[in-house]
Amino acid sequence: MGQEVREPKQERSIEKKNRIVQAGFELFSQVGYYNTNTAEIAKRAGVSTGIVYGYFKDKRDILLDVLEIYVKEAFAPVLDMINNLTAPVNFEGTIGHVLDSAINIHKKYANIHEALHSLSHSDEAVNNKFISLEDEITLAIANKLADLGVKKENLTERIHFAMDIVQSFSHEYVYDHHTYIDYDEMRKIVQNTLVALFDD
């Protein structure tokens, strides 16, 4: 563990490091971050523990690379959707797509999402990554809507508030399952609330 961490340059070494990160992604998703150790990650990746420590200082170091994968895979569709918006913006249709996408992301990445979000409260680097992602998406939407001629007072604040609503609803829809809630009706309320934030 005391050996120097190296950045792989050869194709075989890069592939080996990627296998370790993928193994970490799978194990953190399946059994959680705290229930996984580097020996298990090494075994899943088909390498020795020494190889793991050649590329990563510790398990947390692997987690930060796992977070990069999660962010790219989970949020790329949202950013693509934003980039493809055209004027005049159909907020009802767009927000419907955003809600569907958010629900699907939370379903697909349920375990890793839970693991990473629980760590965001105790790990500064993880928390900073999520804040950076929030900033990137908020500003990307604000810039795109401004380019498309959307003129709303406090646009950035509206977008950030909308993102909080989408996140909260997705958690409720995918994870919480209150028996007294009609989630289809709740989805309509959320969509109408969000449309009212942006539509004239």
Segments from the language model and where they lie:
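N-terminal intrinsically disordered/low-complexity leader segments
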Residues: 1-15
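Helix-turn-helix
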Residues: 15, 19, 23, 27-61, ...
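Pre-recognition alpha-helix immediately N-terminal to the DNA-recognition helix
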Residues: 19-27, 73, 97, 101
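Alpha-helical DNA-contacting segments of helix-turn-helix folds
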Residues: 40, 64-70, 120, 129, ...
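Hydrophobic alpha-helical connector segments
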Residues: 65, 80-108, 149-152, 162
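Amphipathic alpha-helical packing segments from all-alpha helical-bundle domains
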Residues: 72-79, 100, 104-108, 124-149, ...
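Amphipathic alpha-helical segments used for helix-helix packing
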Residues: 82-84, 93, 103-125, 171-176
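Hydrophobic/aromatic-rich alpha-helical bundle segments in the mid-to-C-terminal region
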Residues: 114-116, 127, 146-193
